[in-house]
């Protein structure tokens, strides 16, 4: 993350299992406070404000591959050699890109309502009036990327080696749930669960999400 000063929050004990949580398109690191509190007995959660968001602030360019690289830089800066990576929405895309590009750094992967790497036809609403806690250009860039994802993103799902949990939000989500199922089936060591919450699973059902994440982590070796 050359030239980018990245803000982040930490919750949980120093000897807990390290988990890096990546927020979605209108969130921030603070979006993970409830989940981190539910997991704090065994998990140390690191939650950055991604480029263009919160205290990290605007950047010169935006893409999910840049976010992936920022997160890898954060792991280096914090001397985190191998972690669980959890992402919601666009943060989940950055998470699976990291797992594919740096398998040695990702011990496990949790994808919460990940936009499938197929053209989605998402429509960005008009920019809200007044100051925003994020750079609107970041939202525009990410939505454009999700609507026209590189074909390699779909192809490379088969190369993810980390144990993976895909959390779908059910029929109330705007994402096509059958595509999430296809996505999960394409990742070799993935399983799919549904938390009936729509797209905003972390905000709408944090306790239920914490339970499925805790159970997933508890079943991992080591």
Regions found by a protein language model. Give the residues of each.
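Helical cap/lid subdomains and adjacent loops of hydrolase enzymes that gate the active-site channel
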Residues: 112-159, 175-178
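Conserved catalytic-core motifs of eukaryotic protein kinase domains, centered on the activation segment
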Residues: 31-33, 56-61, 121-122, 177-178
């Amino acid at each position: 993350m050359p030239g980018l000063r990245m803000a982040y929050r930490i919750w949980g004990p120093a000897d807990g299992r390290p988990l890096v949580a990546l927020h979605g398109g209108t969130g921030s690191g603070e979006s993970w406070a409830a989940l981190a509190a539910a997991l704090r007995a065994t998990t140390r959660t690191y939650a950055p404000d991604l480029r263009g968001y919160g205290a990290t602030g605007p950047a010169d360019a935006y893409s999910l591959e840049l976010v992936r690289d920022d997160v890898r830089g954060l792991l280096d800066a914090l001397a985190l050699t191998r972690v669980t990576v959890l992402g919601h929405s666009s943060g989940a895309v950055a998470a699976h890109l990291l797992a594919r590009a740096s398998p040695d750094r990702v011990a496990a992967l949790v994808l919460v309502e990940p936009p499938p790497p197929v053209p989605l036809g998402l429509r960005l609403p008009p920019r809200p009036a007044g100051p925003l806690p994020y750079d609107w250009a970041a939202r525009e860039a990410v939505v454009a990327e999700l609507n026209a994802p590189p074909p390699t993103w779909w192809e490379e799902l088969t190369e993810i080696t980390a144990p993976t949990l895909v959390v779908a939000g059910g029929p109330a989500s705007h994402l096509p749930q059958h595509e999430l199922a296809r996505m999960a089936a394409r990742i070799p060591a993935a399983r799919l669960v549904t938390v009936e919450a729509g797209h905003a699973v972390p905000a709408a059902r944090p306790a239920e999400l914490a339970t499925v994440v805790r159970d997933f982590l508890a079943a991992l070796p080591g």
